[in-house]
């Protein structure tokens, strides 16, 4: 297996809902007019609390500097596990549970914080640039580590870090944060970038203006329904995560879906904003899922984390995570 260190240097930022009008010009340019920018990595996720933006340095320049933009204090690098060579677009998707044991747990054991972004195409593991020597040292026994430089994949240099390493103990990692599962059913999909102009107006409405149109058939007091929408445009590939009500607004022939038309339920992790320094949160969730062989997407945002699991598995997942939660007491 290969671990690719991509060349994007990323910023992770948050914008409050009420401040988003200050940023829509730049965000629309990044999402819909990418040929007019040098940005190659852009992701925007709306949650009930805020908008999380993950963007490379070139794309970050498109956003106005403002007190309303909270930026995480670090430059982040994206790692990508590739099975069978080739770029992330052509390789088989691995799924966050498949990398739980090989990537996520070892990094948690070394107290290296990660920020996850699963897309339709692949899973990106974001690590702080300053942690990279520790990351490569930790994972070098499991992976051939390659670095993308000017679009070419080359062997990553071994930075020879040895001090500061602890022999990982096989620790139990109980789930320590509150969990909730909204009532929404989600799909993870994509569309051909050539068809983006055909749905640009609709996408802009969904992203910035519609404020989450609820299913008119749903009961008016569906308090379990949350606002969640994620759009990523990374190296020319689009990924969309949206609930079924939002999906129904799109022409059905434009969205790619899995042949099974699988729907996903969400586990939301966190009662208070999680911050960026705590290690092991992704591992706490992904390890029990991996043990049960349940596929999952995982999307970290500025304040909370989100795991998506197949709809039919949600009750079992919640039970397994609650058992893990009980173990901390």
Curated annotation (Swiss-Prot):
Principal location class: cytoplasm
GO cellular component: cytosol
Listed GO MF terms: identical protein binding
Disulfide-bonded cysteines: none
InterPro entries for the chain: ACT-like_dom_sf (IPR045865), CASTOR1_ACT-like (IPR049479), CASTOR1_N (IPR040778), CASTOR_ACT_dom (IPR027795), CASTOR_fam (IPR026249), CASTOR_mTORC1 (IPR051719)
Keyword Cytoplasm attributed: yes
Domain of life: Eukaryota
ACT domain location: 72-140, 262-322
Quaternary structure note: Forms homodimers and heterodimers with CASTOR1. Interacts with the GATOR2 complex which is composed of MIOS, SEC13, SEH1L, WDR24 and WDR59; the interaction is not regulated by arginine.
Protein name in the entry: Cytosolic arginine sensor for mTORC1 subunit 2
Organism in which the protein naturally occurs: Homo sapiens (Human)
